[in-house]
Curated annotation (Swiss-Prot):
Its cofactor is Zn(2+). ATP binds at Q85, G103, E104, G105, K106, T107, D493. It catalyses: ATP + H2O + cellular proteinSide 1 = ADP + phosphate + cellular proteinSide 2. SUPFAM superfamilies: Helical scaffold and wing domains of SecA, P-loop containing nucleoside triphosphate hydrolases, Pre-protein crosslinking domain of SecA. Keywords: ATP-binding, Cell membrane, Cytoplasm, Membrane, Metal-binding, Nucleotide-binding, Protein transport, Translocase, Translocation, Transport, Zinc. The gene is secA. Its EC number is 7.4.2.8. Monomer and homodimer. Part of the essential Sec protein translocation apparatus which comprises SecA, SecYEG and auxiliary proteins SecDF. Other proteins may also be involved. GO terms for molecular function: ATP binding; metal ion binding; protein-exporting ATPase activity. It is a peripheral membrane protein. Zn(2+) binds at C821, C823, C832, H833. Belongs to the SecA family. It comes from Streptococcus pneumoniae serotype 19F (strain G54). InterPro entries: Helicase_ATP-bd (IPR014001), Helicase_C-like (IPR001650), P-loop_NTPase (IPR027417), SEC_C_motif (IPR004027), SecA (IPR000185), SecA_CS (IPR020937), SecA_DEAD (IPR011115), SecA_motor_DEAD (IPR014018). This is Protein translocase subunit SecA.
Amino acid sequence: MANILKTIIENDKGEIRRLEKMADKVFKYEDQMAALTDDQLKAKTVEFKERYQNGESLDSLLYEAFAVVREGAKRVLGLFPYKVQVMGGIVLHHGDVPEMRTGEGKTLTATMPVYLNALSGKGVHVVTVNEYLSERDATEMGELYSWLGLSVGINLATKSPMEKKEAYECDITYSTNSEIGFDYLRDNMVVRAENMVQRPLNYALVDEVDSILIDEARTPLIVSGANAVETSQLYHMADHYVKSLNKDDYIIDVQSKTIGLSDSGIDRAESYFKLENLYDIENVALTHFIDNALRANYIMLLDIDYVVSEEQEILIVDQFTGRTMEGRRYSDGLHQAIEAKEGVPIQDETKTSASITYQNLFRMYKKLSGMTGTGKTEEEEFREIYNIRVIPIPTNRPVQRIDHSDLLYASIESKFKAVVEDVKARYQKGQPVLVGTVAVETSDYISKKLVAAGVPHEVLNAKNHYREAQIIMNAGQRGAVTIATNMAGRGTDIKLGEGVRELGGLCVIGTERHESRRIDNQLRGRSGRQGDPGESQFYLSLEDDLMKRFGSERLKGIFERLNMSEEAIESRMLTRQVEAAQKRVEGNNYDTRKQVLQYDDVMREQREIIYTQRYDVITADRDLAPEIQAMIKRTIGRVVDGHARAKQDEKLEAILNFAKYNLLPEDSITMEDLSGLSDKAIKEELFQRALKVYDSQVSKLRDEEAVKEFQKVLILRVVDNKWTDHIDALDQLRNAVGLRGYAQNNPVVEYQAEGFRMFNDMIGSIEFDVTRLMMKAQIHEQERPQAERHISTTATRNIAAHQASMPEDLDLSQIGRNELCPCGSGKKFKNCHGKRQ
């Protein structure tokens, strides 16, 4: 272990030496750039673009380009990037993460690689965690980019598609991570290419990269359509039942945060809902409602996991930032269960139309890099999942902050009493204090205690983050006391007021350890920026979540034996023990995220195939007849092959029924037309007849443009409909294969195999529906102005309304379970009409 650690440290040192040499080369151009007039310096951008177009690489332009940005920043912003900032910029250009402490000027560091990569004309996305930071950075740094001749756009959620398109067309686009994700998904749902807003994803520079790529890695971005099923009554019934339970009726696993009914709880459910057996297959839907009601009432906590807004809406609280996540909802019915619990209006359940996780969104960029002050603890994850290295950059000035050992108390009450006493003492001498909490509830509790102690203060949490930048900016003034949930105000520097350095600088007080060391380091890093003095102190209790999960029972005995109910234990060993517990949690969380990625990679591969083919259809300016006719041919082949083993009469009857109801006019083909033909000949006969019907159908459309439009809408509507159903099916499969793990099967392998089979089935189903709709759609010749609208609505109506029909006189007893159903649905018999037998 010691040897591995030594190797890592030596590698980091070698990398720093290499970066220093590269930074020195940038500095060699300093005098040359300083001698240029403003117009000459601005003209460098045009020169660099021409050199790039003529085959020079961005790497070869780096030294001059960085020097131009340094000189430009000095003239426009009055800021001159330090050597460490140039080093950080080089790391960013190479697609890695420079770990730079708070206050080291990450925003200015980013200007150099952003400028360099924007010269390619392919677009650079600067990604921030919220729109306030996007607007702030785009306004401040945009001044420099515009002066140097580059265009800057800001992509906000409130902008129209046209405004978004303009923002993405700029050389540099500032946006939040969520908005880029949603724009990507929406672009892959449009019917016309001109409605797409994004260009191909080229280079992303992610601010607070650990927050977005690690903390929110598993967060799926979901575009949903409303589900019409009215289920609010079931949510209320399940909630009412769950609220009637005693503690013995359910079992909670604190460590994994799972809950289930005990035997007595099951008995009560069967009595309450008047059932013979709660876990009968007919009651699967009901158990889903009960499970969600249990989680909502006994796992999900008000003011910690969510808050109730003034508009009576349930808002999720981000566990890492303490902010509410506007527009986000828990999926799978949990959000509705919480709404029932809190007695607010229950919103309709939704159906997923498209989804992607941040992990897979950002892996789609040709080049990805990011900035953080605390990335080294997650280095393995950055490397394994994103192929990114984390390189610690030295501080411009030595860190002066004093990090005190943790103080451990027996109870939460004695811990908070000590916190309030410490804050009051520091307030009285004028030293500013920032108190970090992990939950809104804790912030409110400490606030009440400080009011009682006569200490004026500001509270920054999920309930009032609109004022967060202003509150954080004042947090370093003399006598300021600020309470903040976790990393609220991240991205805004706390600058020390007059006379504060002499008082010891900003003191950061943590009220409990987070399960991630990185979040604790971020809180500490609010103090001691740019060589300022500062202090940090964490207060813990045996009743904290982290301590309860890992070994507080042993320490509890020590406190009781020594009769130390109000006193604290302070030792470096304790701090190391806590960090060891945190490492275990981080390891568990990483393993979980890695497994999620294995599942999500199945969806990613399938999504890329669908979206690529969808894009080809949208952007095609030609007749799509070859593609549609190929689908018709493959569909005929599947149906004929699906009945290859049946008796001749049964086979011909099934194929004839398929042709009548899905392919040809009903009276245009008889049994005699097919008898005596080989399977190959039957396929060819049906295909040739289908081509005539196809020609007849398209001839009803007025002109070539109408044909193209009809073809596009037809294919896209079918694909979107089937893909949406497939996403839901994959979600259900994922839940189901988890149970197979208990049968000694690897659930990921099962998911991959089953997901692949389902995808192939979906492709067959898409081609079947396109065939059926193309051949059976009621197309009427239209005047040109109405044609487009008619085409769209006809295709949509057919797709939505056309149900697979089964001839009444057909004998189903001879059809094999794995043969295609003769109704023409494209499904296997066992999954269609065979299921009803």
